[in-house]
Design a protein with these regions (language model features):
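Non-catalytic scaffold segments within catalytic domains of secreted glycoside hydrolases
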Residues: 1-61, 70-393
Length: 393
């Protein structure tokens, strides 16, 4: 059955600067992916902004994006590089001229090497440094932003980088997790105040990475409790003392073993379990409703779906997933939950962090030799939904 979303619902796509722009001087530069590629040239977005702007505008009236901190600011408290500022401003002006709602993300994983070398968010001294960066972001780009994320998936950044040791700086220390969490939550609150002082009417929040975490057997009880109570619960709480909405990403269900706690599964293991899956996780669209209801009950704030998608080369599966997820989201809205926006991850295939470019989420295909973008069938499907506010049968 076809379903209709309310007038004013926000449809768009989401990207991260580090995954689409050539690496400048951030801590992901030169990282080798699981499939052997080096994190350097990603999708040449900085050279193809005009073409990419047309793609973005074809996929809805909103765009969630970040900027490369390392390109903009070359040292702590330093002035922004004027040519980079102008480059970003021209792109933002193009989006605004087309009526695009811009959600500006101030921190999406990648940090300048100078920031990392000083200890990053393991040190309280990082807080004023980050606030200074955000103050300059407001000065140069605030007029273009329609809404803000202070941090993208801070829990994912913390756990992957300081507990599981999968992201830079590859640490595995729970006490460091707590220290980084404390500093990032304080930074969030300081930046929230800064943004609301400058633009009181523009909504501010984070994007929380979510999955459905369930133990694979009775032996996984501790991992399940830890993931739900600490990761989905306590960490999220720290960023919602000051927030105008709950932003959330969702990708599937993670079956938990006793140890080690794992965030990303493998197709081989998923196939052995006999569950439907993409290249990273179990396909579990009803789970987005579980998380939405949980956050609605816990925080009582409007909910924005800041990322949702499927990692696969099977585009028919991607189309199916968009339909399935939107039906679940619509059902939650029918129950009275205030959901304002849906940003699909992602507009075009990008460099999927430590996994590499072979892990594809895009509505457009990226040829990683020529960097040419070509639309997949899912692009037309999602574009029609965004244009009509209607999900077909």
């Amino acid at each position: 059955m076809a379903i209709r979303f309310p007038d004013g619902f926000i449809w768009g796509t989401s990207t991260a600067a580090a995954q689409i722009e050539t690496a400048f001087d951030h801590q992901w530069k030169g990282v080798q992916s699981r499939t052997g590629e080096y994190f350097q040239r990603t999708t040449d977005h900085e050279k193809r902004r005009g073409e990419d702007l047309e793609i973005i505008c074809s996929l809805g009236k909103a765009y969630r994006m970040s900027m490369d901190w390392s390109r903009l600011q070359r040292s702590a408290y330093g002035e922004f590089h004027p040519e980079v500022v102008q480059e970003y401003r021209e792109f933002l002006e193009g989006l605004k001229a087309r009526g695009i709602h811009i959600m500006l993300v101030l921190h999406h994983f990648a940090e300048p090497l100078w920031f990392t070398r000083e200890g990053g968010f393991t040190r309280a001294t990082a807080i004023p440094v980050f606030v200074d960066f955000c103050r300059k972001m407001v000065r140069y780009f605030g007029e273009y932003a329609s809404s803000w994320n202070t941090f993208n998936e801070p829990g994912g950044y913390i756990m992957m980088g300081y507990f599981l040791g999968i992201f830079p700086p590859y640490q595995k220390n729970f006490f460091t997790v707590l220290r980084v969490l404390g500093n990032m939550s304080k930074a969030h609150e300081a930046v929230y105040d800064l943004l609301k002082e400058a633009y009181p009417d523009k909504p501010v929040g984070i994007s929380k990475h979510t999955m459905v975490y369930e133990r694979e057997s009775a032996l996984g009880w501790f991992a399940e409790q830890f993931s739900n109570r600490f990761y989905l619960g306590y960490i999220t709480d720290q960023f919602h003392r000051k927030a105008d909405f709950v932003g959330m990403s969702y990708y599937g269900r993670v079956p938990l073993k006793p140890m080690p706690i794992s965030e990303i599964d493998t197709p081989g293991r998923l196939a052995k379990r006999g569950v439907r899956h993409d290249d990273m996780w179990e396909y579990y669209p009803q789970g987005i409703g579980t998380i939405i209801r949980r956050f609605h009950e816990r925080y009582g704030l409007p909910i924005w779906i800041t990322e949702n998608g499927l990692c696969t080369n099977d585009d028919a599966f991607r189309v199916e997933s968009i339909r399935d997820y939107l039906h679940v989201i619509h059902q939650c809205m029918e129950e009275g939950i205030d959901i304002r926006a849906y940003f699909h991850w992602t507009a075009w295939d990008n460099f999927e962090w430590f996994l590499g470019p072979q892990y594809r989420f895009g509505l457009y295909n990226t040829d990683f030799q020529t960097m040419e973008r070509t639309p997949k069938g899912s692009a037309a499907y999602f574009s029609a939904i965004a244009r009509t506010n209607r999900v077909p049968d």
